[in-house]
Swiss-Prot record:
Catalytic activity: alpha-ribazole + adenosylcob(III)inamide-GDP = adenosylcob(III)alamin + GMP + H(+); alpha-ribazole 5'-phosphate + adenosylcob(III)inamide-GDP = adenosylcob(III)alamin 5'-phosphate + GMP + H(+)
Enzyme class, spelled out: transferase
Organism (species): Clostridium perfringens (strain ATCC 13124 / DSM 756 / JCM 1290 / NCIMB 6125 / NCTC 8237 / Type A)
Protein name: Adenosylcobinamide-GDP ribazoletransferase
Enzyme Commission code: 2.7.8.26
Gene: cobS
Membrane spanning residue stretches: 36-56, 60-80, 110-130, 141-161, 181-201, 202-222, 231-251
Coiled-coil annotated spans: none
Pathway annotation from the record: Cofactor biosynthesis; adenosylcobalamin biosynthesis; adenosylcobalamin from cob(II)yrinate a,c-diamide: step 7/7
Needed cofactors: Mg(2+)
GO terms, biological process: cobalamin biosynthetic process
PANTHER family xrefs: ADENOSYLCOBINAMIDE-GDP RIBAZOLETRANSFERASE
One GO MF term attached to the UniProt entry: adenosylcobinamide-GDP ribazoletransferase activity
Stated role: Joins adenosylcobinamide-GDP and alpha-ribazole to generate adenosylcobalamin (Ado-cobalamin). Also synthesizes adenosylcobalamin 5'-phosphate from adenosylcobinamide-GDP and alpha-ribazole 5'-phosphate.
Entry-linked InterPro entries: CobS
Length: 251
C-alpha cells in the first residue's frame, strides 16, 4: 500500500502542477506510474468539467468561457505536453532527413514551425470549444477526454520502442510488460463503454476517433523518427484531445 501511495504521489508530481509533499524517487513505485496515468486524466478531467460548471454558473460569456476552459488542462499539466507538441512539430515539419529531425527534436531553441503549429492548434481548438459550448452538448465529456488520451499514451509508452536512451524508457518502461498493456487497453474499452452509456453515440465516436488518430500519428512518428519519447508522447496526447474537441464541434 505504501508503494502504491508513493506511485500516486510520483505520478501526480510528474504530470501535474498540483502541490504535493516532497518524496524520494522509488524505482519500485515507478513501474506503476503508467497504470496510474489514467488516474491523472480523471483528475484533470474532473477539474476541467468543474471549471465549466463554475463559469457557466457565473454566466461568463461563451467566447470568454471557451478561452478560459481551453487553458485549464494546459495549466494543470504545466504546459508539459504542449511543449512536446511544439518540439515534435518543429522536427516533423522541417522535412529534413531522420538524423536532422532528431537533432531538431533535441534542440531547445523554439523554431518557426513550432510557433506556427501551436498558434494554429490553439486557434482551431478554441473554435472547436466555442462551437461545443454553443451546441449545448453534455460537457461531462470533458471528464472522459483526458482519461482516454492518457490511457492510449500510457499504452504507447509501455509497448513501443523508445528513441535512444529516453528517460521514459528508464523510468516508465522498465518493469512493465504485457499485463500493463492489457490493463491500459482494458481501461480504454471501459472508458468507451461508460461514455456510450452515459453520454451517447456521438460522444463515443469522439473517444474512438481519438484512438484512431493516435495510431495514425504513432505510425507517422515511428516512420519519420524511429520511435517515441516524452516529446512524442506529448505531441500525440495534445492532438488526441484536439481531435476529441474538434469532432464534437462537427458532429
Amino acid at each position: 500500500m505504501k508503494i502504491f501511495y508513493k506511485a500516486i504521489n510520483m505520478t501526480l508530481s510528474m504530470f501535474t502542477v498540483i502541490p504535493l509533499p516532497k518524496y524520494e524517487w522509488d524505482d519500485r513505485a515507478a513501474k506503476h506510474i503508467m497504470k496510474l496515468y489514467p488516474f491523472i486524466g480523471l483528475i484533470i478531467g474532473a477539474l476541467w468539467y468543474l471549471s465549466f460548471f463554475v463559469l457557466s454558473k457565473l454566466n461568463v460569456p461563451i467566447m470568454l468561457m471557451a478561452a478560459l476552459i481551453l487553458t485549464v488542462p494546459y495549466i494543470l499539466t504545466g504546459f508539459l505536453h504542449l511543449d512536446g507538441f511544439m518540439d515534435v512539430s518543429d522536427a516533423l515539419l522541417s522535412r529534413r532527413d531522420k538524423e536532422t529531425k532528431l537533432r531538431i527534436l533535441k534542440d531547445s531553441t523554439v523554431g518557426a514551425f513550432s510557433v506556427i503549429s501551436v498558434v494554429l492548434l490553439l486557434l482551431v481548438e478554441f473554435a472547436g470549444m466555442f462551437t461545443v459550448l454553443n451546441k449545448n452538448l453534455d460537457m461531462r465529456i470533458l471528464i472522459f477526454i483526458p482519461i482516454a488520451s492518457r490511457v492510449i499514451n500510457g499504452y504507447f509508452i509501455v509497448s513501443q520502442e523508445m528513441l535512444g536512451q529516453s528517460s521514459l524508457a528508464k523510468f516508465f518502461k522498465e518493469g512493465t510488460g504485457k499485463v500493463d498493456e492489457i490493463i491500459l487497453l482494458g481501461i480504454y474499452v471501459l472508458v468507451a463503454l461508460i461514455t456510450f452509456f452515459t453520454l451517447g453515440i456521438n460522444y463515443l465516436i469522439a473517444i474512438l476517433a481519438m484512438g484512431l488518430i493516435s495510431f495514425i500519428l504513432l505510425l507517422k512518428v515511428k516512420k519519420e523518427l524511429g520511435g517515441i519519447n516524452g516529446d512524442v508522447a506529448g505531441y500525440i496526447l495534445v492532438l488526441m484531445e484536439f481531435t476529441g474537441i474538434l469532432l464534437l464541434g462537427i458532429i
